[in-house]
Amino acid sequence: MANACTFEGFPSDRKVLKVLTLGHSLTVDSCHFLALIAAAEGDPGLKIATLYYSGCPLSRHVEYLQTDSDRYSLYESNSAEPTPPRITPGMTMKKAVEQEDWDVILMHGGTFEPAYETTYGTGHIQTIQDYVNQHKTNPNAVFGWHMHWVFPTDPELMALYPYTPNGYQVGYEKFGGGRKELYEAIARCMEKYILTDSTFRCLIPTGTAMENALAAGLTEKDIHRDYAHATDYGRVMAGYVWYCVLRGIDHLDDIKLDRIPVKYFRSNKGDQDILLTQEDKKLLLEAVNNALKKPLQVTQSQYTVK
């Protein structure tokens, strides 16, 4: 085991590592800067693709693979030529799986789904894995799981949900707890169902890194841009967690990414590069390293955000 998140048999030592994720917007957020991060770390061999459908739960993945639906979009980037992800609409899961000889296929649930034990007894995970195994072109490809982050409870962020009723307020009401309780429920399910499933060879604890950042004194508005999604700072944090797990890094010595070029922003993100300060890097490094060391536990920070 290279670290607490990368298990025996994970192909982290490949010079070129090809990764396909089956996800939604939180996956897109996590991978948005991943190629840029890998390039900054001197690693030109990471290729990442996300098969995206908005908020996609496991049940919808099953529906779409059974009907060969082309309602997905495929987001692709690679660290040899780090640019914002290229988006191809009208993609099916079959086409995405067969497109490359992927080394790793990553999965995760939709919105609140990973917090419920009933999620892991539906058979959806097995159905998706069977389908991928049927169509993958690399017989040695392995599966991993993305432990995505908990959603903000800040009223101003929650109010940015564009529909009525508010799906995230309803989700929290149905769950019956707050942010802390939701994180703990997800962590319990990871320990009980994912870490004990030998078909998964890695766990990417993005959600734990986010909670570690909050423990350092950051606010939800520092890491979330709305009711669910990450700020650019949150995206960098998520990207570093992904990079370390995918490359089997158990401890990151420093953050080599210095700036995020303006071409990576959406239109409402301004017109200048984002520079990462030493304070930014210090907090990022701690949150990421603590998540790698203790992926299912929030670690209190030695820093205090002013």
Indicate residue ranges for each PLM-predicted region.
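Cysteine-dependent hydrolase recognition
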Residues: 1, 174-177, 290, 306
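Short hydrophobic segments within beta-strands
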Residues: 20-22, 51, 146
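N-terminal module-boundary/linker segments of secreted carbohydrate-active enzymes
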Residues: 2-43, 284, 295, 300-305
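Alpha-helical cap/lid subdomain in secreted, periplasmic
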Residues: 90-228, 232, 244
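Residue-level signal for beta-strand positions within conserved beta-sheet cores that form or flank
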Residues: 15, 44-46, 139, 199
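Conserved catalytic region of serine esterases and O-acyltransferases that act on ester linkages
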Residues: 222-306
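Conserved SGNH/GDSL esterase-like catalytic core that processes O-acyl groups on lipids
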Residues: 26-122
